[in-house]
Design a protein with these regions (language model features):
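Histidine-centered divalent-metal-coordination microenvironment in nucleic-acid enzymes
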Residues: 85-108
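Acidic-leaning, charged glycine-interspersed low-complexity segments
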Residues: 128-167
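SsDNA-processing nucleotidyl-transfer enzymes
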Residues: 8-41
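Signature for HUH/AEP ssDNA processing cores
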Residues: 30-91
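Helical (often loop-to-helix) elements that flank the catalytic cores of nucleotide-handling enzymes
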Residues: 105-128
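Long, low-complexity, charged/polar intrinsically disordered accessory regions
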Residues: 171-214
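Short amphipathic alpha-helical segments
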Residues: 59-67, 112, 116, 120, ...
Length: 214
């Protein structure tokens, strides 16, 4: 029957998505370690971007996707010291479409995470004609410290604990969000990252083997 066929297709889709999730999780540590191969310290900024409630009725997946792609391009053009980013698109009844983004900057160039987070958020508001909203997660760093999960702000190459916290936090972004499946056509991405040129490890800096996400 058609119903059983649809159910089978849904189960296969979930299976495929879980496989992609596992692959993405494994790649996170490799991605972060490759950045530390080239930089002694990284400034990590977490930003949540979305839309104001008055704009919810106008939102479509294509509009949200185009806005996100345009925003990430603008940030790359505006900040040459941006060395990486990872994003995850989510959907909720209360917040509708929203995206969690972790921006990673060369820590030798940028040091002020809170003010930079505000600047990144203001770029989003500006390009969305003030229909967009954002939350700068840097203001919650004290809470993260108390919970033992602080992996944002300045992260030094030698700070094993903070690097593991960073990888764990980024691994969360790869988790399968079942709510968005209802509004997301098969084949559309909910997770992505800034592609980097071929790895060129910094001279004199040994590769790390201890920062893993499993």
């Amino acid at each position: 029957t058609r119903r059983s066929s649809d159910l089978k297709a849904h189960r296969q889709r979930l299976k495929n998505l879980k496989r992609v999730e596992s692959r993405n999780q494994r790649s996170i540590a490799t991605y972060v370690n490759s950045l530390f191969d080239q930089h002694a310290k990284l400034l990590v900024i977490r930003l949540d971007i979305g839309y104001r409630k008055a704009y919810y009725d106008q939102l479509t997946l294509d509009l949200v996707t185009n806005d996100l792609n345009g925003y990430l391009r603008r940030i790359q053009n505006k900040y040459p010291a941006l060395v990486g980013y990872i994003w995850k698109l989510e959907y909720g009844v209360d917040r509708r479409f929203h995206t969690h983004i972790t921006f990673i900057f060369n820590g030798a160039i940028h040091q002020r995470d809170i003010s930079l987070g505000i600047a990144l958020g203001e770029v989003w508001e500006d390009m969305s004609d003030n229909n967009g909203s954002y939350f700068n997660c840097q203001v919650r760093r004290e809470e993260y410290r108390e919970w033992g999960t602080d992996g944002i702000g300045m992260v030094h190459y030698s700070d094993t604990t903070k690097r593991i916290n960073l990888i764990n936090a980024l691994s969360y972004l790869t988790k399968l969000d079942t709510q968005i499946l209802a509004v997301l056509p098969a084949g559309r991405r909910t997770f992505g990252r800034m592609e980097r040129p071929s790895r060129q490890p910094r001279l004199g800096r040994p590769r790390l083997l201890f920062c893993r996400s499993d």
